[in-house]
Amino acid sequence: AQVTGFQEKPEHPTPVPGDEGNSLASMGIYVFTARFLVDELRRNAEGVEPGHDFGHHILPRIMGREPIRGFTFSGRGTGAHGYWRDVGTVDAYYRANMDLLGDPPGLDLYDRAWPIYSFQPSFPPPRVAVVPEPSGRPAGGSRHNIFANGTVSTGWVRGSVIGFDCRVDAGAVVEDSILFSRVTVGAGAEVRRAILDKGVQVLPGARVGCDLDEDRARGFVVSECGVTCVAKNAVVGV
């Protein structure tokens, strides 16, 4: 469809013709040739525009000179409703990841009629193994999680999204958290309501997300809703 106008977060959006109760909203997904986009960004940087915001300044100017087409996304081909979230804050990003774990999930990664294509590293399938303690009690388990390839978990993991090539050792607890790739959580460590970036090491017995004041004192970012963020390649000790 031909795009004839663009409004950046208007207070009263223009309704769809013939459907006064609905408006078309940009999902923030744009496709350009690299040369065209670079030229437009340079033109904006060298020009006299009052700002450099994509929605406020760059896209409206392009629209005045070039034809722009829009794709009306509505979950076509699947029984699921369309899914869109603004993940511009830590808490919004966290909630969107937790949507993957719902029953039913807000966004179903396993819907064959609506495939989600992403990077697939060459690792073996994830392995969740329960190693018994000397007492005979299990030292781990799994409930309502997503594990990416190459991950090995022998600890307790609940309500979490785990990236590829991670390790959760026996006796460790990971709960309501997001682990990026190559994260290690040592034996007896605890990670609760946290986002751990790539390559983070949580040493045996260490804690993340259990005491927010302690997290802040260590320099970790804690969101408004209490989600602790640990930066890439950080080592978290006791």
Give residue spans per PLM region.
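Conserved core of the sugar-phosphate nucleotidyltransferase
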Residues: 1-35
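Left-handed beta-helix
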Residues: 12, 35-238
